[in-house]
């Protein structure tokens, strides 16, 4: 049975956070996360796609979300920034993930790991990004609704 993408996103968040805080090598971070007993529940391929993809594209992803923020990217908490990077990566690079799912999963990460109202901020920023990068998909959804 394939693992859960939801769990893969949670481990990706932990990996990006560890990379931001400690600056350790991503391969070492991934190896450490895989030792966690709960990792077997994760979709490992999706975890690798997200973790390595987000870190490879971090500058581009940050530049895409920066104009949508009310503060500098560097002023975001590491958790908020990590979640926004994951959501932005999914919106930009994972067309198999519906835009609503990408946003909702990021909001759920923020509710679980972020500050009190961080999920509202995450939702607002990613919704603006989706309006730009998934405009055709959103327009189709509006016509169906």
Curated annotation (Swiss-Prot):
GO molecular function: RNA binding
Protein name stated in the entry: Transcription antitermination protein NusB
Alphabetical UniProt keywords: RNA-binding, Transcription, Transcription antitermination, Transcription regulation
Annotated function: Involved in transcription antitermination. Required for transcription of ribosomal RNA (rRNA) genes. Binds specifically to the boxA antiterminator sequence of the ribosomal RNA (rrn) operons.
A single BP term in Gene Ontology: DNA-templated transcription termination
GO cellular component: cytosol
Matches recorded under Pfam families: NusB (PF01029)
UniProt keyword Signal, yes or no: no
Organism, scientific name: Thiobacillus denitrificans (strain ATCC 25259 / T1)
Superkingdom field: Bacteria
Family: Belongs to the NusB family.
